[in-house]
């Protein structure tokens, strides 16, 4: 059972905006959840792992920490972290999974996760199960990281990251087994455009099973799909764009 002081109720938007209109398709329903409050911004401290818990809101597992002053908090479980381990934050910590270091002090080729984009703002990058980034270059002001997408990005050297990769690496190999498990997760069916009527999708219509009748695939709103660039503004901190599938 989760710690009562570290959970709260929350209302999921299930793909709707404030007016109730669908802005993200294929979302809705699902089992009721309670949000686990996670400590994304870890201060210099020492704590002991008291339990490893399931979190319905993310793919990673959570580690429950007990601090020496009696406080408790949740963090993402790093790969290899187990009950009874001691985790530290700060430059005095050893280079072990789950310990937090400033990027400027982390050696090259080290795997890291839960990375801050802005110093003292809290972890924002690389938080999904099994993910890790690699430190590839360092300068006095910035550290270059290779992210899971293949993108190489500069981040301020005084930002912090957690050593190691996120645990629960087998998450990507799970088999849901039936449509009902997707519905429990709040994922609604995805209908092919070619199975719709012409009024509903540019690919719709035709007699029986037939092609889309267009020179290229289109979105439900008539815009080109597959291979069209969506990022307009360049980012000065991105040294190499992510690898395309």
Curated annotation (Swiss-Prot):
Region called Disordered, residue ranges: 192-216
UniProt cross-references to PROSITE patterns, sorted A to Z: RIBOSOMAL_L2 (PS00467)
GO MF terms held by the record: rRNA binding; structural constituent of ribosome; transferase activity
Keywords: Chloroplast, Plastid, Ribonucleoprotein, Ribosomal protein
Pfam families: Ribosomal_L2 (PF00181), Ribosomal_L2_C (PF03947)
Localisation: Plastid, Chloroplast
InterPro entries, alphabetized: NA-bd_OB-fold (IPR012340), Rib_uL2_dom2 (IPR014722), Ribosomal_uL2 (IPR002171), Ribosomal_uL2_bac/org-type (IPR005880), Ribosomal_uL2_C (IPR022669), Ribosomal_uL2_CS (IPR022671), Ribosomal_uL2_dom3 (IPR014726), Ribosomal_uL2_RNA-bd_dom (IPR022666)
Family statement drawn from the similarity comment of this UniProt entry: Belongs to the universal ribosomal protein uL2 family.
HAMAP family, sorted: Ribosomal_uL2_B
Assembly with partners or alone: Part of the 50S ribosomal subunit.
The name this protein goes by in its record: Large ribosomal subunit protein uL2c
Gene that specifies this protein: rpl2
């Amino acid at each position: 059972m989760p710690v009562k002081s570290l959970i709260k109720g929350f209302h999921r938007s299930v793909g709707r905006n404030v007016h109730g209109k669908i802005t993200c398709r294929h979302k809705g329903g699902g089992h009721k959840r309670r949000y686990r409050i996670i400590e994304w911004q870890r201060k210099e401290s020492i704590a002991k792992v008291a339990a490893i818990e399931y979190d319905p809101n993310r793919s990673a597992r959570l580690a429950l920490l007990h601090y020496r002053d009696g406080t408790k908090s949740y963090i993402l479980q790093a790969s290899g972290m187990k009950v009874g381990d001691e985790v530290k934050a700060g430059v005095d910590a050893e280079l072990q999974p789950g310990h937090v270091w400033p990027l400027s002090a982390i050696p090259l080729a080290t795997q890291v996760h839960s990375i801050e984009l802005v110093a003292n703002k809290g972890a924002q990058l690389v938080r999904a199960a099994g993910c890790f980034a690699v430190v590839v270059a360092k300068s006095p002001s910035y550290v270059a990281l290779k992210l899971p997408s293949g993108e190489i990005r500069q981040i301020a050297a005084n930002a912090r990251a957690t050593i190691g990769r996120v645990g629960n690496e087998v998450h990507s190999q799970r088999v849901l087994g039936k449509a009902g498990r997707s519905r429990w997760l709040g994922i609604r069916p995805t209908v092919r455009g070619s199975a719709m009527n012409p009024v509903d999708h540019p690919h719709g219509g035709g007699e029986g099973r037939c092609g889309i009748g267009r020179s290229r695939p289109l979105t439900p709103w008539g815009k080109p799909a597959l291979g069209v660039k969506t990022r307009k503004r360049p980012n000065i901190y991105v040294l190499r764009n992510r690898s395309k599938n």
